[in-house]
């Protein structure tokens, strides 16, 4: 039995990975005159941000906490996330809030799910301010 998780940045890539696993498993099975049973169980869908929503979130965050405190991640994150169900139905963006204190570099600080993480609870103030500003801006409608 081989088990694992497939994480991808698009459904197309996920399908290609599944096809590749199937081909390799069937090839190895045939080479050894063995039987293979392949089962895939869908987990969370791929999490894909709406570009306009991501721009909106970044703009609002920059206004609230300053452009130096915001960053657009250069590469997609392949987390398994239940928020992906929301993004499959409603345009939106997954926004990360750093819990790193101002005394540490976020680029080298331990990630949030690490056993070495050191949260600065003052970061929650920024999170509440940013999310509140996004909600208020969204509810006020597009600029005229």
Where do the language-model regions lie?
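Metal-dependent amide/peptide-bond hydrolase catalytic core
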Residues: 1-144
């Amino acid at each position: 039995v081989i088990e694992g998780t497939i994480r991808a940045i698009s459904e197309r890539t996920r399908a290609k990975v599944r096809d590749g696993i199937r081909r390799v498993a069937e090839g190895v099975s045939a080479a050894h005159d063995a039987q293979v049973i392949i089962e895939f169980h869908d987990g969370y869908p791929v999490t894909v941000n709406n570009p306009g929503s991501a721009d909106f979130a970044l703009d609002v965050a920059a206004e609230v906490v300053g452009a130096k405190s915001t960053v657009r991640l250069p590469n997609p994150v392949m987390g398994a996330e239940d928020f992906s169900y929301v993004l499959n139905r409603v345009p939106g963006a997954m926004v990360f809030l750093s819990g790193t204190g101002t005394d540490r570099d976020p680029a080298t600080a331990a990630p949030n799910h690490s056993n070495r993480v050191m949260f600065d609870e003052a970061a929650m103030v920024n999170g509440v301010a940013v999310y509140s500003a996004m909600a208020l801006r969204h509810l006020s409608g597009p600029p005229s």
